[in-house]
Amino acid sequence: MADQQTTMPRWVPLLLGLLGSTTCGMLLYAWSVFIKPLNAEFGWSRAEIAMAFAICCLIFGLMTFPAGRLSDKMGPRKVVMTGGVLLAIGFILSGFIQSKYQLYITYGVIAGFGGGMIYLPPIATAPKWWPDRRALATGFAVVGLGLGSFLMGPLATYIIEKPGMGWRYVFWYCGVAMGIMALIAGAFLEPPPAGWKPAGYTPPAPPAGAAAPKVTRDWTYEEAKGDTKFWLLYLAYFCGSFAGLMVIGHLAGFGRDAGLTAMAAAGAVSSLAFSNAATRILSGWFVDKIGIRVYFAALFALQTAAMIAIFQLGGSVVGLSIVAIVIGWNYGAMFTLFPATCLQFYGPTAQGSNYGLLFTACGLAGFAGPWVGGWLKDTTGTYYLPFLCAAALCALGTAIVFMTKPPEKKHA
């Protein structure tokens, strides 16, 4: 067993994961503040603008799978640092675009590609340092997704509205900052040595009087992807992500349509982001204390209700912020609960590959949710139908996560 004293302090991977996920949060979750400026300058429809965000979410989500495989094989450091360079290039180039197709390539493809490489390796690495608090470690590593959007929403709005600046400066300034953040996050990230465990930690013993446990092993990637329960989790992840990303992609636009000012709508985005961040840590704590399945199902059910309540409450700053907080809480919790569930079901050995494949559901939902929301809004003139569809998917997700139990352990 590796000597505990020869390794880095185990809180370091948590901070590096936080920094990396904050970078990804800045990339993705404040996109709705760009809707009005891009519409005003270019006359693009909501669906056309949402397509850039949808492509970014798709590429981001799909890229996590090869990023996880590469992280398992060659370590997380090179993967994250390469992603940081690509993200910075794509974001900065987005400040020079003159057509929607250029934006689709720079922001959607290049920045999304880089973001996907940054996101997954820290999530797969951090829990390996915390076998005694895996869900909590996962939650802390991903809390930056909410923190990044909490920072980016008002910051981007301030730059956009500042005389002599505008939306292009957001891409330029923030692109440089995000690249630096990702390079720092990747430069020091590494998994623990083989056989390492924290000082004083002893794996839980079986209950008194229980039969001697059989020797078990973790599931391989090939075994996990052949398990029916894996694909039930995949479907549930798609349902929850579809609803959450639809709202994130259109929340500020919904608020502006309801008569709120740009800063008030951005405030609702920040409320969602703050809740999105807080739940990633607190949900991990709840899971470590009370278990995952019932808590998971309750959150899906609550998000279903919030998707419907937005039409009654979304016309005021306070009402929209309350709904945003609820949606942000439940959406953000998924990014603690799904990796923790994947880890619980299939073990840590192939977590990078297993969760990388599972996370592609979020990428597909990220493409479908914002674009479908924008297209239905343009077609019907209201967000009623897209948000109702999202509520139905959340209800389906509730049933799936409540009924899906861990698979049998593999025997060595």
UniProtKB/Swiss-Prot annotation:
<feature type="topological domain" description="Periplasmic">
    <location>
        <begin position="96"/>
        <end position="99"/>
    </location>
</feature>
<dbReference type="InterPro" id="IPR050327">
    <property type="entry name" value="Proton-linked_MCT"/>
</dbReference>
<feature type="transmembrane region" description="Helical">
    <location>
        <begin position="76"/>
        <end position="95"/>
    </location>
</feature>
<feature type="transmembrane region" description="Helical">
    <location>
        <begin position="293"/>
        <end position="313"/>
    </location>
</feature>
<feature type="transmembrane region" description="Helical">
    <location>
        <begin position="168"/>
        <end position="187"/>
    </location>
</feature>
<feature type="transmembrane region" description="Helical">
    <location>
        <begin position="46"/>
        <end position="74"/>
    </location>
</feature>
<keyword id="KW-1133">Transmembrane helix</keyword>
<dbReference type="GO" id="GO:0015293">
    <property type="term" value="F:symporter activity"/>
</dbReference>
<keyword id="KW-0769">Symport</keyword>
<feature type="topological domain" description="Periplasmic">
    <location>
        <begin position="381"/>
        <end position="382"/>
    </location>
</feature>
<feature type="topological domain" description="Cytoplasmic">
    <location>
        <position position="75"/>
    </location>
</feature>
<feature type="topological domain" description="Periplasmic">
    <location>
        <begin position="161"/>
        <end position="167"/>
    </location>
</feature>
<feature type="binding site">
    <location>
        <position position="119"/>
    </location>
    <ligand>
        <name>(S)-lactate</name>
    </ligand>
</feature>
<feature type="transmembrane region" description="Helical">
    <location>
        <begin position="383"/>
        <end position="403"/>
    </location>
</feature>
<feature type="transmembrane region" description="Helical">
    <location>
        <begin position="228"/>
        <end position="257"/>
    </location>
</feature>
<keyword id="KW-0813">Transport</keyword>
<protein>
    <recommendedName>
        <fullName>L-lactate transporter</fullName>
    </recommendedName>
</protein>
<feature type="transmembrane region" description="Helical">
    <location>
        <begin position="351"/>
        <end position="380"/>
    </location>
</feature>
<feature type="transmembrane region" description="Helical">
    <location>
        <begin position="134"/>
        <end position="160"/>
    </location>
</feature>
<feature type="transmembrane region" description="Helical">
    <location>
        <begin position="262"/>
        <end position="290"/>
    </location>
</feature>
<keyword id="KW-0812">Transmembrane</keyword>
<dbReference type="InterPro" id="IPR020846">
    <property type="entry name" value="MFS_dom"/>
</dbReference>
<feature type="topological domain" description="Cytoplasmic">
    <location>
        <begin position="404"/>
        <end position="412"/>
    </location>
</feature>
<dbReference type="GO" id="GO:0005886">
    <property type="term" value="C:plasma membrane"/>
</dbReference>
<keyword id="KW-0472">Membrane</keyword>
<feature type="topological domain" description="Cytoplasmic">
    <location>
        <begin position="188"/>
        <end position="227"/>
    </location>
</feature>
<feature type="topological domain" description="Periplasmic">
    <location>
        <begin position="41"/>
        <end position="45"/>
    </location>
</feature>
<feature type="topological domain" description="Cytoplasmic">
    <location>
        <begin position="130"/>
        <end position="133"/>
    </location>
</feature>
<dbReference type="Pfam" id="PF07690">
    <property type="entry name" value="MFS_1"/>
</dbReference>
<keyword id="KW-0997">Cell inner membrane</keyword>
<feature type="transmembrane region" description="Helical">
    <location>
        <begin position="317"/>
        <end position="346"/>
    </location>
</feature>
<comment type="similarity">
    <text>Belongs to the major facilitator superfamily. Monocarboxylate porter (TC 2.A.1.13) family.</text>
</comment>
<keyword id="KW-1003">Cell membrane</keyword>
<feature type="topological domain" description="Cytoplasmic">
    <location>
        <begin position="347"/>
        <end position="350"/>
    </location>
</feature>
<dbReference type="InterPro" id="IPR036259">
    <property type="entry name" value="MFS_trans_sf"/>
</dbReference>
<feature type="topological domain" description="Cytoplasmic">
    <location>
        <begin position="1"/>
        <end position="10"/>
    </location>
</feature>
<feature type="topological domain" description="Cytoplasmic">
    <location>
        <begin position="291"/>
        <end position="292"/>
    </location>
</feature>
<feature type="topological domain" description="Periplasmic">
    <location>
        <begin position="258"/>
        <end position="261"/>
    </location>
</feature>
<feature type="transmembrane region" description="Helical">
    <location>
        <begin position="11"/>
        <end position="40"/>
    </location>
</feature>
<feature type="topological domain" description="Periplasmic">
    <location>
        <begin position="314"/>
        <end position="316"/>
    </location>
</feature>
<feature type="binding site">
    <location>
        <position position="280"/>
    </location>
    <ligand>
        <name>(S)-lactate</name>
    </ligand>
</feature>
<comment type="function">
    <text>Proton-coupled L-lactate specific transporter.</text>
</comment>
